[in-house]
Amino acid sequence: MVSESHHEALAAPPVTTVATVLPHNATEPASPGEGKEDAFSKLKEKFMNELHKIPLPPWALIAIAIVAVLLVLTCCFCICKKCLFKKKNKKKGKEKGGKNAINMKDVKDLGKTMKDQALKDDDAETGLTDGEEKEEPKEEEKLGKLQYSLDYDFQNNQLLVGIIQAAELPALDMGGTSDPYVKVFLLPDKKKKFETKVHRKTLNPVFNEQFTFKVPYSELGGKTLVMAVYDFDRFSKHDIIGEFKVPMNTVDFGHVTEEWRDLQSAEKEEQEKLGDICFSLRYVPTAGKLTVVILEAKNLKKMDVGGLSDPYVKIHLMQNGKRLKKKKTTIKKNTLNPYYNESFSFEVPFEQIQKVQVVVTVLDYDKIGKNDAIGKVFVGYNSTGAELRHWSDMLANPRRPIAQWHTLQVEEEVDAMLAVKK
């Protein structure tokens, strides 16, 4: 038995005992950092292997990577912006009503503030303080004074008006002076108007001019003499400095009256209506022919004692302030709505058509005295408004007559515009 066991022991292969020597820290678990590094290294190695398999040069791969990164960033930015925009819209929706109300209130408050400031400025100009009454009458502005004389010639039924001199006139020009002259006329008809000469750059002009009105003494009592001092302006409407009125029924014509009178502010008159005129314009460029047809006028100002007029029309072709040609219509007696239908032609070369002016003046014919202008209008160079439109329409439609109504203007105002050179 012993021999069998011994025999088995000898027959079995020898068992080698290997002692495994562990490192000092083998019993400690691997740290998390090392595990992550190994994983990252493996991924990197795998990625690089795959990358090398792609049949593209390195620069192309880098470019693709940059584009991909940019696309991702752009998408992120758009998403963020959309979210913020939605939030803002919601906030605006909630505050909309209140915000508008505040804005309106701000506007009203601003208007009130400006109004208050304007009132304060007015007070400062007039020298008023909070404790002073605003209702106190303002001191009347000094407009100067005028010396005149009045006499009546009973033998010839003539009223003689002398304009002697003016003094202490206000300065209306930039240089601290004025260019005064005096207008003299009788109300209510205003038909006969006289003007003195203009005295340049002075506040104390000496006129020494006399004017004669032919008025029967029996009619004189119902009239009022007006003397108005104006400041002459070459390029715009003349400014009135002041005026005064003398009712003829208050004057003693038994002797010559000579006195000084203070000028007063002129009453603001409504723009006097002078009437309207209709005429047509036709221009043929190839022939250089301008045709003006005076058709009719309406609602003309009454110029005669009987409440009518004897109107006719003058047409002037002008360039650079010079009259090149003059034409006139027939006279229509005792009417304020004359019908003419009269044609007039002027030779105007095409190169000159933009430089000329057609001046249309309606006058009242007077057998004895001077023919008075009722009103005036001009088309062409330097014209404005309806007049410029008419001229432009004519040029835009060659060979076709273009008719249009025009409102008559005061002669002096039109002359001032014609004098302006652009």
Swiss-Prot record:
Cofactor(s) this protein cannot do without: Ca(2+)
Keyword set, alphabetical order: Calcium, Calmodulin-binding, Cytoplasm, Cytoplasmic vesicle, Differentiation, Glycoprotein, Lipoprotein, Membrane, Metal-binding, Palmitate, Phosphoprotein, Repeat, Synapse, Transmembrane, Transmembrane helix
Residues recorded with modification Phosphotyrosine: Y230
Molecular function terms from GO: calcium ion sensor activity; calcium-dependent phospholipid binding; calmodulin binding; metal ion binding; SNARE binding
Record-listed Ca(2+) 1 binding positions: D173, D179, D231, F232, D233
In-chain residues carrying the UniProt-annotated modification Phosphothreonine: T129
Positions contributing to Ca(2+) 5 binding: D304, D364, D366, D372
Entry-listed glycosylation sites: N25
InterPro entries: C2_dom, C2_domain_sf, Synaptotagmin
Coiled coil segments of this chain: none
Membrane-crossing segments per the record: 58-80
Lipid-anchored residues (S-palmitoyl cysteine): C75, C76, C78, C80, C83
Modification comment: Glycosylated.
Residue intervals on the Vesicular side: 1-57
Residues modified to Phosphoserine: S265, S343, S345
Family statement: Belongs to the synaptotagmin family.
Protein name per the record: Synaptotagmin-1
